[in-house]
Design a protein with these regions (language model features):
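Glycoside hydrolase catalytic-domain context in secreted enzymes
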Residues: 17-633
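Positively charged n-region of N-terminal signal peptides that target proteins for export
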Residues: 1-4, 515
């Protein structure tokens, strides 16, 4: 009996020493899980695990590469509490991950869908939702949990470097299209992050610029689209922007992230910073910015010290932790989804080809130039961009795709004949130009920036004569690309001397022979057309149509489909006609200081601060207020 009692007491002691089992996320309440977390675990959970390829105070752990190579960030796992890491990856024209992996013969290319401006030009919410479903499927099947998209900042000025990602100068169009995109993505059981909240309308000094704006303009123009998206699609997350708004960082702004977003709009998801955004981790936690990405060691230290010193009440940190855990509970990684790494890329290519045609805008079409007549078989194809088509912009909005269909390829796929000698001239010229046009590799984020385009090739009189004799019609493509860290130059809005000479020469030669000229605009942002629009017979605004761009444009040119796009941004006669142009950085240099290490702030207009003096009169609202203004198109 004594022996049995001894073993019973021994077993009880062992159980007591082990203590109760730790609560598990998904099995126990979120509150119980938070109650079991150490302060250090809480601090880790609200900051990311680092970003591969960065160093110094930017890296915390750097496990991003171990989950989905090329993804933008991950969260901190706590296995003892059943908390997995989840993956956040860039968009919005498609998932951006590494297509090639070390020691792996498989490829992981994603579909490059049309840019945001083109999708918005469809004015078709059902179509955008279908595109979102396809993108969301790739997010799911490649093992990501949250797509860092859509981007719905307002097209305040034609020169913004990331206008291609954004939808419109109109907040209603922006909000409705964003909501449709979010619904499509999230129908796959993966999340979105509507961005950049808010008033992030220039790339120049975006990490420190102070947007000075009236409450009315803020509400009616720059926040309205976000409000629509929040209320009509319930995005899982919102991404705060880099910039200040009236003197306060967006990621440290309690009125923006808590009072308005949560209390007024009833947003129930998580708020995440843009990568390296903000300065004060404690202020960000207090404001309601729940997660700091990609995560920096000094942010962890600030949060720990903030709680210990009383500057950050632990109940506030618990609130942020709860929102992160509620996000994780929804994700495929938490649900242990067995992703295939094999989405149906062929089906998604068909989606991008078809969807792009609906957003193309026919700006001019004299004498029924388009669609091509059936007798048109031979095409004189001019312009470097015809042979080197632009799928989309650069930076986090780019997609690592398997291919891009050029206009040359699209026309040939449809059975049109292209002169081989002219093709060879262009290909040799483009190859030589591309060797000269390289980025400064010393810049830490140069891979995100746009590569300079080739100077336009002007055909000789002999070449023109040969093409007029051979071809039924002339087609000229003009291209523009843009991306992160730098806004477009004034010269990018206007046509170069070489481009103007090309248009004049081709138009004169072909019109003299009674043959027509078509211009295709493969652009991500508005350009000037007033000075040359009378030269060609037709102008097709193709935007940047994704990886199937050449096929999509050919479908329109041939009459297989009708271009049904509508402009979402005004094409002004001159850049300075735009109300915001006096308060926008012109030809400013790129700034890749994503960590904003410079504490001293100067007072350079339109760089350190930008006055939104046009107030609510953005785009067409301004032009409609004038007594008389003849819009370019």
């Amino acid at each position: 009996m004594k022996k049995q009692l001894f073993y019973l007491l021994l077993a009880t002691g062992v159980l007591s020493a082990c203590g109760p089992a730790a609560p598990q996320l998904g099995k126990d309440s979120v509150e119980d899980v938070i109650g079991a977390m150490t302060l250090e675990e809480k601090a880790h959970l609200v900051i990311g695990t680092g970003m591969v390829g960065t160093s110094g105070d930017s890296t915390v752990i750097g496990t991003t590469k171990k989950l989905v190579p090329g993804a933008a960030g991950t969260t901190y796992p706590i296995p003892r509490l059943g908390i997995p890491a989840i993956v956040l990856a860039d968009g919005p024209a498609g998932l951006r991950i590494d297509p090639i992996r070390e020691g792996d013969s498989a490829t992981y290319y994603c579909t490059h869908f049309p840019i945001g401006t083109l999708l918005a030009s469809t004015w078709n919410q059902d179509l955008v939702e279908e595109v979102g479903k396809s993108i969301g499927n790739e997010v799911l099947e490649y093992g990501a949990d949250v797509l860092l998209a859509p981007a719905l900042n307002i097209h305040r000025n034609p020169l913004c470097g990331r206008n291609f990602e954004y939808y419109s100068e109109d907040p209603l169009v922006s909000g409705k299209i964003a909501a449709a995109y979010v619904r499509g993505i999230q129908s796959n059981g993966v999340g979105t992050s509507i961005k950049h909240f808010a008033v992030n309308n220039q790339e120049t000094n975006r990490n420190a610029n102070d947007a000075r704006i009236t409450p009315r303009a803020l509400r009616e123009i720059y926040l309205k689209g976000f409000e629509i998206a929040v209320k009509e699609s319930a995005p899982w997350t919102v991404m705060s922007s880099y910039n200040h708004i009236n003197g306060t960082y967006a990621s440290e702004n309690t009125d923006l992230l808590s009072t308005l977003l949560r209390d007024e709009w009833n947003f129930e998801g998580m708020v995440v910073t843009d990568w390296f955004g903000g300065k004060d981790a404690v202020a960000q936690m207090i404001a309601g910015n729940d997660m700091l990405q990609p995560g920096r060691a000094n942010q962890y230290d600030m949060i720990i010290e903030g709680v210990k010193s009383g500057k950050l009440d632990e109940s506030i940190l618990n609130r942020n932790v709860k929102r992160v855990l509620e996000l994780i509970l929804q994700t495929p990684h938490f649900k242990e989804y067995k992703y295939s790494n094999k989405p149906d890329l062929k089906a998604h290519a068909a989606v991008t080809r078809q969807s792009a045609t609906e957003g193309m805008v026919l700006l001019k079409n004299n004498n029924e130039t388009l669609p091509f007549e059936r007798k048109v078989r031979n095409i004189a194809l001019f312009g470097c961009t015809s042979y080197d088509f632009i799928a989309g912009g650069t930076g986090s909005g780019n997609v690592n795709r398997a291919y891009t269909v050029s206009l040359l390829d699209g026309l040939k796929n449809a059975g049109y004949q292209i002169d081989e000698a002219l093709k060879a001239d262009y290909e040799q010229y483009i190859e030589a130009e591309n060797k000269k046009n390289t980025l400064d590799s010393s810049q830490p984020f140069s891979r995100f920036m746009p590569v300079p385009r080739p100077t336009e090739l002007i055909p000789t009189t002999k070449v023109l004569s040969e093409q007029v004799a051979k071809a039924d019609v002339a087609l000229v493509t003009l291209g523009r690309t843009s991306g992160e860290f730098v806004d477009r130059n004034v010269s990018d809005f206007e046509l170069s001397e070489e481009e103007l000479q090309l248009l004049k020469s081709v138009s004169q030669a072909f019109h003299a022979a009674g043959k027509k000229v078509v211009v295709v605009l493969n652009i991500g942002g508005v350009i000037e057309t007033a000075s040359w629009k009378k030269l060609p017979d037709a102008i097709l605004l193709a935007w940047q149509a994704g990886q199937e761009g050449g096929n999509s444009v050919t479908d329109v040119l041939s009459g297989k489909v009708s271009p049904s796009g509508k402009l979402t941004m005004t094409f002004p006669n001159k850049l300075m006609d735009v109300a915001s142009s006096t308060n926008f950085p012109m030809d400013a240099r790129a700034n890749t200081d994503v960590r904003n290490k410079e504490d001293k702030r100067s007072s350079v207009k339109n760089v350190d601060y930008t006055d939104y003096e046009e107030d609510i009169f953005v785009g067409y609202r301004y032009f409609a207020s004038l007594t008389a203004y003849f819009i370019n198109i």
